[in-house]
From Swiss-Prot:
Additional observations: Involved in the renal transport of a variety of drugs with well-known nephrotoxic potential, therefore may play a role in the etiology of the drug-associated nephrotoxicity. Uptakes the diagnostic agent PAH/para-aminohippurate and clinically used drugs. Mediates the bidirectional transport of PAH/para-aminohippurate.
Species annotation: Rattus norvegicus
Reaction catalyzed: (6R)-L-erythro-5,6,7,8-tetrahydrobiopterin(out) + a dicarboxylate(in) = (6R)-L-erythro-5,6,7,8-tetrahydrobiopterin(in) + a dicarboxylate(out); L-erythro-7,8-dihydrobiopterin(out) + a dicarboxylate(in) = L-erythro-7,8-dihydrobiopterin(in) + a dicarboxylate(out); L-sepiapterin(out) + a dicarboxylate(in) = L-sepiapterin(in) + a dicarboxylate(out); prostaglandin F2alpha(out) + a dicarboxylate(in) = prostaglandin F2alpha(in) + a dicarboxylate(out)
This protein's GO CC annotations: basal plasma membrane; basolateral plasma membrane; caveola; plasma membrane; protein-containing complex
InterPro entries registered for this protein in UniProt: MFS_dom (IPR020846), MFS_sugar_transport-like (IPR005828), MFS_trans_sf (IPR036259), Orgcat_transp/SVOP (IPR004749)
Bias (Low complexity): 526-537
PROSITE patterns: MFS
Protein name per the record: Solute carrier family 22 member 6
């Protein structure tokens, strides 16, 4: 009897699974909001230099007298004239037509607050010579996500999924709330980094805790559900940001609910699979019997005992001798192969995804509308991905989503910018494919790595995704040399990654591996199967040769 048989004995997919999956997945609605929050909290409204304090606009000829025009005929955002360009002579003897000498906005800026009444940009003047600080805030958030994936992924394998999730909910709630009350830019960035750390871990542990409590045939459903919840979170952000335009209030609205998640997370049941992998049979038995009671299978749960578990889970008990370390990903050839291939998939997906998302302003429409469109395309894309995952397997779904995304982006690079509708449609289609790739890779990675190092593997994969999101803005700078160069790079990487997917094994209908030995056995099994097929193909040829020799 394997662990999957024990799950069936205590109810399979019952009341417990429905309750816990719902409670674990619910906070992901707001996780999506945090990931793209700065699209609204750090929005840049139209702005221009503030005229000198002693300026008299009625005498100088109006505001236009102080504002030079850019190449598009719009007022400059970061420069003003040193003196008005028409009107009576100025105090320094300037003629009516002015000197046309410009200077930076030494008296500050005037912002158009009609759409965004308050953002971190307007509050701390993150424009012009300070505009890099706006991107720095988002980069630091991504650094936090990177650190969280590594640190908490490791801790979850050591301490358990439940304990780390409880800590993450509290950290997200506290750091997000503190960011809303940040007195200055530096404090804001510190708390955003802490939020990024905890949110990365929530995403990873949410998938793992749910998958480890589900039978084999339902794991794809859970992965797809999590993907849909994330997409719905993008819709939610558009609505919340529209209703709560002040950045501090918006930051609070998406952070405070994590206090609720922190409270009810104490009722989560730790993964019995993790307990058994840690050699804690007493806790494994307690967890399974508790699940059996919730699922109405109390009699079946009563049949379980320490001896039954010891007999049934001999393989899992071998893990109690010691957990695998992160270095095992590089030491063991089997794990190293998985690590390198999956790292490429994670990097390519995130790299291309953020390459598209960071160009949202190029659509020239309302940011709220863009948020809705990019959330809407995920729904049909992930549904198609779900069908492929369940019918054809994880590997074809992963390969197709990356390949189609890369093709859409590459084609976009050769279409003239005047064809706005075509370019926008391709970008939306490419984004949908990349969203499907994210949906698939979370499930695929969790099924490929053994229990002993599953969280560490997911954490390292998420780390590579964050590296991709950090590198992506740097690639966008190549547009200065050739406008379509970023699109060619963003498209080529997922195409190459789709080919790498062919080097990974299929996991459809396979039990979750618990040890590295399971991976080796799976690999040897496939090699033996291939050899048997080759022998079957050779037998008719050998028989034909013997007949000819007999003649």
């Amino acid at each position: 009897m394997a662990f999957n048989d024990l799950l069936k004995q205590v109810g399979g997919v019952g009341r417990f699974q429905l309750i816990q999956v719902t409670m674990v997945v619910a906070p992901l609605l707001l996780m999506a909001s945090h990931n793209t929050l700065q699209n609204f909290t750090a929005a840049i409204p139209p702005h221009h230099c503030r005229p000198p304090a002693n300026a008299n606009l009625s005498k100088d000829g109006g505001l236009e007298a102080w504002l030079p025009l850019d190449k598009q005929g719009q007022p400059e955002s970061c420069l003003r004239f040193t003196s008005p360009q028409w009107g009576p002579p100025f105090y320094n003897g300037t003629e009516a037509n002015g000197t046309r000498v410009t200077e930076p906005c030494i008296d500050g800026w005037v912002y158009d607050n009609s759409t965004f009444p308050s953002t971190i940009v307007t509050e701390w003047n993150l424009v012009c010579s300070h505009r890099a600080f706006r991107q720095l805030a988002q980069s630091l958030y991504m650094v936090g996500v990177l650190l969280g994936a590594m640190v908490f992924g490791y801790l979850a394998d050591r301490l358990g999924r439940r304990k780390v999730l409880i800590l993450n909910y509290l950290q997200t709630a506290v750091s997000g709330t503190c960011a809303a009350y940040a007195p200055n830019y530096t404090v804001y960035c510190v708390f955003r980094l802490l939020s990024g750390m905890s949110l990365a871990s929530i995403a990873i542990n949410c998938m793992t805790l749910n998958v480890e409590w589900m039978p084999i045939h339902t794991r794809a459903y859970v992965g797809t559900l999590i993907g849909y919840v994330y997409s719905l979170g993008q819709f939610l952000l558009a609505g919340i940001a529209y209703a709560v335009p002040h950045w501090r209030h918006l930051q609070l609205v998406v952070s405070v609910p994590f206090f609720i998640a922190f409270i009810y997370s104490w009722f989560f049941i730790e993964s019995a699979r993790w307990y058994s992998s840690s050699g804690r049979l007493d806790l494994t038995l307690r967890a399974l019997q508790r699940v059996a009671r919730i699922n109405g299978k109390q009699e079946e749960g009563a049949k379980l005992s320490i001896e039954v578990l010891r007999t049934s889970l001999q393989k899992e008990l071998t893990l109690s001798k010691g957990q695998a370390s992160a270095m095992e990903l590089l030491r063991c050839p089997t794990l190293r192969h998985l690590f390198l291939c999956l790292s490429m998939l994670w990097f390519a997906t995130s790299f291309a995804y953020y390459g598209l998302v960071m160009d949202l302003q190029g659509f020239g429409v309302s940011m709220y509308l863009i948020q809705v469109i990019f959330g809407a395309v995920d729904l049909p894309a992930k549904f198609v991905c779900f069908l492929v995952i369940n019918s054809m397997g994880r590997r074809p779904a992963q390969m197709a989503s990356l390949l189609l995304a890369g093709i859409c982006i590459l084609v976009n690079g050769i279409i003239p910018k005047s064809h706005t509708i075509i370019r926008t449609s391709l970008a939306v289609l490419g984004k949908g494919c990349l969203a499907s790739s994210f949906n698939c890779i979370f499930l695929y990675t969790g099924e490929l790595y053994p229990t002993v190092i599953r969280q560490t593997g997911l954490g390292m994969g998420s780390t590579m995704a964050r590296v991709g999101s950090i590198v992506s803005p740097l690639v966008s700078m190549t547009a200065e040399f050739y406008p379509s160069m970023p699109l060619f790079i963003f498209g080529a990487v997922p195409v190459v990654a789709s080919a790498v997917t062919a080097l990974l094994p299929e996991t459809l209908g396979q039990p979750l591996p618990d040890t590295v030995q399971d991976l080796k056995s799976r690999s040897r099994g496939k090699q033996n199967q291939q050899q048997q097929e080759q022998q079957k193909q050779m037998m008719p040829l050998q028989a034909s040769t013997q007949e000819k020799n007999g003649l």
